[in-house]
């Protein structure tokens, strides 16, 4: 079965028609979606599509029906977290996303989640009462109409060169060796651990770098491959993997699949990879 338009533009065609969240396979055209669902799809993917473009039933679940449930950590809009914050989260709704994006000048997506610390920062910075905030929320019909008018398809050119617009969600800042070494144990190797699509060679699993097997991507889009499952470095053809990570609260998450990779790995210091 051919991939859907959403999968093609996001370069996630390998995910099209998966039956992990739905038993059915097939397509919907975007004009079959409600105006609210079309708006959410646009904001959550950063894409522009026409009503004749298609979305497979798997991507409907991922970006519309179950998007909120699949957000497992704080979106960290202020880049303050050294570790993933996964406790006491609350969802950013459509009106809040619109209001806060305008207020802070950065894209906040409906369905993302905030931890108590980021919520306190927002509450401390947004010095308006509820009535004022309500008046400043855009008119729902007007916002939807404006967004739908922008759903015009633009050929992005060669699909392998597709990248989200620069003004969209920034890549999570996990590249500093000092912060990476403090909460992530790394196993390096001389040979590749991941294939050219970012899948583990020894198992074929599309494992997120947060090590949650059910996670469908919780990092900012990788500038190299576009995946939201790549942490500090793109997984495509990567020669190392995370053995464990530490999240806020001191909880350690171990990579259950690390043992299977030992046959591919050569002995060396766990942090040698950070000296590159």
Curated annotation (Swiss-Prot):
Pfam families: ARF7EP_C (PF14949). The modification Phosphoserine is found at residues 182, 266. Keywords: Cytoplasm, Isopeptide bond, Phosphoprotein, Ubl conjugation. Residues 158-177 are annotated as: Disordered. Interacts with ARL14 and MYO1E. Through its interaction with ARL14 and MYO1E, may connect MHC class II-containing cytoplasmic vesicles to the actin network and hence controls the movement of these vesicles along the actin cytoskeleton in dendritic cells. This is ARL14 effector protein.
